[in-house]
Amino acid sequence: DEFNQGLGKRKAIYKQYSQAFPNAYAIDEKKCLYQSRGRAQGKDICKKCETACKAGAIDHMMEDQELQIEVGSIILNPGFQIFDASKLDYYGYGKIKSVVTSLEFERLLSASGPFGGHLVRPFDQKEPQKIAWIQCVGSRNVKYERNYCSGVCCMYAIKEAVIAKEHSHNPVDTTIFYMDMRTPGKDFEKY
């Protein structure tokens, strides 16, 4: 499940995320028994989704299409590239089960996330007693060609620490480790 950063499991038929546009379901070709095994061999394996879909919207033979549509405006969202925290093996990301990235933690806290917004460790679903954020992992680092500050991570970590305390059923100790706290917006220093 890419949207939940691989923390949740996805069924063969899924909606990418709750506010997806268009508000439509898709079939994961790798999980669908017909798409992954039956179609190539010409066998009618499973296809239970066709029977269950009252609207008759499932067409396993549909091919990709390229459409030209008239629109009133275009939103350009160039995106960003997430730093691969496993490159810095001394933090344990990818080796220690309880180490997650901020984006993964964001999905853990989300009501539409894999644990329904409950603050739990992904590997054992138990509530943590202590949480630490390590700032500037990969940024402000010439070695990884990211010698700049992202400009958002400090406020992001503060927000996550506050929300973690709100979502926890028991007191949780939160700590943010940083080189220097950068809060670039008006009145952000108050946090």
Predicted regions and their residues:
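Residues forming the flavin
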Residues: 1-191
